[in-house]
């Protein structure tokens, strides 16, 4: 039943955020997070027990080459201020792709901030 109440948040990250996130995979349950494989040129390699997390293909020659997917409960997306603070904290170092309502909420938040300070 939990699976039916989950929504996938997908974003792509710049290298600095990818490196930060790959070190802190304990934030979400292991069956609810998927992260990009490392750059082949990167000397860092995941330890064997964490290989299952690194299942998404890196997008070569892209400004945001590291896709990340996190399955979260619907209520987290709608009401959890900590989740939104966490996502917004990455600022221009991530590009949120889905769900669309989160993309729109982030656009509105940054538009409101821009109006406030300009």
Regions from the language model: what does each represent?
Residues 1-118:
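Polybasic (Lys/Arg-rich)
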């Amino acid at each position: 039943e939990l699976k039916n109440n989950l929504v996938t948040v997908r974003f792509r990250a710049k290298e600095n955020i990818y490196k930060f996130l790959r070190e802190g995979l304990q934030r979400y349950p292991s069956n609810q997070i998927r992260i990009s494989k490392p750059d082949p040129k990167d000397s860092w390699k995941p330890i064997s027990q964490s290989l299952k997390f690194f299942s998404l293909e890196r997008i070569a020659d892209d400004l945001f080459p590291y896709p990340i997917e996190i399955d979260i409960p619907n209520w987290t997306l709608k009401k959890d201020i900590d989740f939104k603070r966490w996502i917004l904290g990455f600022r221009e170092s991530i590009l949120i792709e889905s769900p669309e309502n989160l993309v729109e909420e982030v656009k509105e938040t940054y538009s409101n901030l821009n109006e406030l300070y300009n």
